[in-house]
Amino acid sequence: MAERANLVFHNKVIDGTAIKRLISRLIDHFGMAYTSHILDQVKTLGFQQATATSISLGIDDLLTIPSKGWLVQDAEQQSLILEKHHHYGNVHAVEKLRQSIEIWYATSEYLRQEMNPNFRMTDPFNPVHMMSFSGARGNASQVHQLVGMRGLMSDPQGQMIDLPIQSNLREGLSLTEYIISCYGARKGVVDTAVRTSDAGYLTRRLVEVVQHIVVRRTDCGTIRGISVSPRNKNRMMSERIFIQTLIGRVLADDIYIGSRCVAFRNQDLGIGLVNRLITFGTQSISIRTPFTCRSTSWICRLCYGRSPTHGDLVELGEAVGIIAGQSIGEPGTQLTLRTFHTGGVFTGGTAEHVRAPYNGKIKFNEDLVHPTRTRHGHPAFLCYMDLSVIIESEDIIHSVTIPPKSFLLVQNDQYVESEQVIAEIREGTYTFHFKERVRKYIYSDSEGEMHWSTDVSHAPEFTYSNVHLLPKTSHLWVLSGNSCGSSLILFSIHKDQDQMNIPFLSVERKSISSLSVNNDQVSQKFLSSDFADKKKSGTPYYSELNGILGTSHYNFIYSAIFHENSDLLAKRRRNRFLIPFQPIQEQEKEFIPHSGISIEIPINGIFRRNSIFAFFDDPRYRRKSSGILKYGTLKADSIIQKEDMIEYRGVQKFKTKYEMKVDRFFFIPEEVHILPESSAIMVQNYSIIGVDTRITLNIRSQVGGLIRVERKKKRIELKIFSGDIHFPDKTDKISRHSGILIPPGRGKTNAKESKKLKNWIYVQRITPTKKKFFVLVRPVATYEIADSINLATLFPQDLFREKDNIQLRVFNYILYGNGKPTRGISDTSIQLVRTCLVLNWDQDNKNSSLEEVRAFFVEVSTKGLIRDFIRIGLVKSHISYIRKRNNPPDSGWISADHMNPFYSISPKADILQQSLRQNHGTIRMFLNRNKESQSLLILSSSNCFRIGPFNHVKYHNVINQSIKKKPLITIKNSPGPLGTSIPISNFYSFLPLLTYNQISVIKYLQLDNLKYIFQVINSYLIDEKGRILNLDPYSNVVLNPIKLNWYFLHQNYYHNYCAETSTIISLGQFFCENVCIAKKEPHLKSGQVLIVQRDSVVIRSAKPYLATPGAKVHGHYREILYEGDTLVTFIYEKSRSGDITQGLPKVEQVLEVRSIDSISLNLEKRIKGWNKCITRILGIPWGFLIGAELTIVQSRISLVNKIQKVYRSQGVQIHNRHIEIIVRQITSKVLVSEEGMSNVFLPGELIGLLRAERTGRALEEAICYRAVLLGITRASLNTQSFISEASFQETARVLAKAALRGRIDWLKGLKENVVLGGVIPAGTGFNKGLVHCSRQHTNILLEKKTKNLSLFEGDMRDILFYHREFCDSSISK
């Protein structure tokens, strides 16, 4: 030992890492005994000092970091700006989430780093600081939560909650923070429990694989080795990892520097020798590893290397397998939840920032950079090579070099302030992360209409889908609006000055009830929650469902259409709409009760000739029970074609209705129950039951009679026939017929009885199997069809007073074919006969071309009285948006007085004098000159849509006066556009009509002598609530009033505005929020320009959503979206978290050889290397064997690197040799692939690699096999010991197979002996007879083999070394 005088005194704080290093050096120099003596002294000293100090912990010792205030404030400011950018549509949700998390993570980390220097400066003997810093109790991250900030938390799914906990535990948490903290804490507790069990099971499987590996020999005589080089072709291996890899190994080859041998084969590498080799700059060092050991079920001392416990070569008999398994499994149980701040959103992928040292101007070469977008959505420049950035201030010029693939966040010649971030250096570009693809769905915040910019690829990704891909960064817009039930009914035709209710059929999307009707099942089932509340059963009776066309005075309000339920009875065929009405007042008594009349209007509002206009269900022809309809061979005329007729009942097969020429039909009742296949039926087929007999567990019969059970596909049909059972004798005539109706008066001719029948009966012959047949006589209900129903009965006389050329005829239809069964659902009744009103019109010359007419509802208000009418218009009515070619250019409006009216409207004066109700507009209708097309305009009467006008705008009285000249409608002072109309050419001639309606079809403004240039776009209707109706026939959108923004541009500065900004506001243009339109104020909301006028612009509010390339857009252009619909799916890659909670599954994934989605970054280089190498392999005998060998070597190295990387990311040091022993076991089997060795092995059999080689050499015959990677579980079940396999998993299967095959267990492993209670064949004092230490013999054998196989062995070693250089992704990882 050195003299005390020569010792150096280190006055330093020693932490845990330094202690570890010190102890390993002491063991190296002085051995175990001396080191333990020194450590005892250190322990005693520690206890003495701790007793003397007697540290206690109080709440005052938790000192908050002073810089926390401004750090948190700064982060909040950044988050606020980020939120704004997201709102403006500059960044999308994924970028926002990413950046938000990075901002708070960086803040939290900075605080954590500040903590120790702060303690050191202010209070170095602070108990909290001493405890955490020494590692005695707690660690930095726990103390950081006490005195710094608690930071980001994960939710139970492992996703980040992007709201951080800004408080620390010393300050206390707010309510929100407390709840989020509970999330994180709960996840922590659950993760700890799960991790402990996972790690325990992983350890068990690892030990299972390698329990039999014991050091049995000193040298196996291998000449193979693996070369390790500090300077790999791809990147530098860090020196620390290089030293860790080499220390404790044994050299496989001599190392020469020049001609001098500095280290020889089989020499173990200590720290001194390794340092010397590094100093000499040795290129590659070949070392022995467990991979190169030639043994199958054991390992030799030299291939294993030094024992980790005492620093000498491992001793014979040591169970190194179990040590390896424990070493890999143990960190999983011991590690605390490290860095679980990120919950896997990103890991250590935070970039280094380059900050400006002082204020100044930035200069760089713009040719070397290229504009891009960072992953946070910021504009930046990407530099491809080293870029020199100069910062010039008044007196200093500072130059910074930025490495390639970094982002430059400032522009050339930009002024920067001190400490401003100017560049972002990404972390080492070669580090290979496990990436996972994550989908993030963006949902619509509001209802509206979808618009794309032109950048979306309009062809969907798949033929039948509505998913479109985005080729470049662009915006998607959701234009505000609410869907309206059907704009086609509303706006088919309106008469001039009709007042109309705009939200007439508006329906909530979710309340259109679905019809659950099977074929031939008559009644409809309305699944509506509103109905369910009002009635016990969810299926209301028929009479309540059918609305009414009320009669007396025809006073209706639109809300009578089941408005509280909002149920429109949408039919199976989508082209029809059924609108039931309810009357307000009582009906006059002479009319039929209002239980049934319903108007049926097609959903597009178009009637064809002979189509049904209304129908009436007479309650006399209504049955509650199921049954069969019969009308024998009576004549029936089919009067309506299938395509024009809709089956009201929802039957899938659209049968034509039959008009009855005869006035009688019959109904044979029966009780029918349709039961699921699995029902337990409590009655037998052909048995007779009484009333209220239990049929199944919860169904009782309503009538008594004969049971018939029919089993059909997936259901059971159970019928109960009521009636008499008649056992006939041979002479009975009735018994010969089956299924016939017998009228009254005919008797049963029978020897015993002769009886006249009072009613019709139905005779049915029934033959139960193997029994005598009998006849069932069933009662029949007879119905007469009355001809007395006509128009006068159904409707009052004055209803159709202007029906000049409209014809309405009344028909009775039987709704079921002859012999067809009718089925009722639950409580609903069945209508057998329907009275229908068929619509037709005159065939005069003028309208002979009209094959179809339009119908719609009109609500007219007169003197406070509100009336609803149905109007059928016999004019061709295409709302024209675009002028037809044959129109003369000066075509204008013609009054529509000569139109053929269906009904008269109350005097116009009444309409004008009354004050219009809030939800009404007035329709102006124009007929174009050629009388072929119509257009309409809804004018409004109030100014409630003038949202926040500018105060300085004055309205001119001229407008109002010009309107009064021709008093069309009462208009209050309303500056805004009231509607839009078709092409206008001769503008000034129609000034009185159109002044107030500065037509909204202006495409752009040109202020040249106030001549306007008009161009046509889509028309919109605006009502007085400010609701705009889109007249597109394919979309039903109502825009909401509150979401329209009006901007008034004062006429005085309008010229200046155009001149200065030289912007042209064009219709349809989109604006993001905060963009300046007018000179004085920025535009506050985002939207689309809808109307441009001389003094105002109307903007339809819209919300932009940014989407980046590769995003998937759902839905089609102009599709109506509802709140919560998916708009976009972002697919982005995120690094899988290096968190141990996620890290353990990753280790397990590698060891179980499950697929990983990611592909290695240097795959291309590997393939090139293979191509070079393959030519050498092909020329060698046993080339396939070398191929398999190379594959196995490569996979082994790759697996070791992957596992090491996970542990190193956690700061856990595990020696490579432990992992190598495990990996060797899972890669040591090959699969026999062909019949080449059928005399020895079977194809598909798993055999050891070394065994395959030896067998091949012995038989001098090629074995075809391929390398397989077994997971640790499969490897445990493919060992030489069936006792070991059986004690692991699948005990019965393993033992049964072993018995059938007659397997022998030689009890070589540890586990088998433990199971059978024998002595464990391991340990340094174990019987030496088992340990083969004949080193001399091995060497002699080796020499012989080398002579015989020198060609093969030498070449192979070269290939292995060569391959090691190009495929080694470096053990460092």
Swiss-Prot record:
SUPFAM superfamilies documented for this protein: beta and beta-prime subunits of DNA dependent RNA-polymerase
E.C. numbers: 2.7.7.6
Coiled coil: none
Compartments, record wording: Plastid, Chloroplast
Record keywords, A-Z: Chloroplast, DNA-directed RNA polymerase, Metal-binding, Nucleotidyltransferase, Plastid, Transcription, Transferase, Zinc
Keyword Transferase carried by entry: yes
GO biological process, one term: DNA-templated transcription
Pfam name, any one: RNA_pol_Rpb1_5
Zinc keyword on record: yes
HAMAP family hit by this protein: RNApol_bact_RpoC2 (MF_01324)
Protein name: DNA-directed RNA polymerase subunit beta''
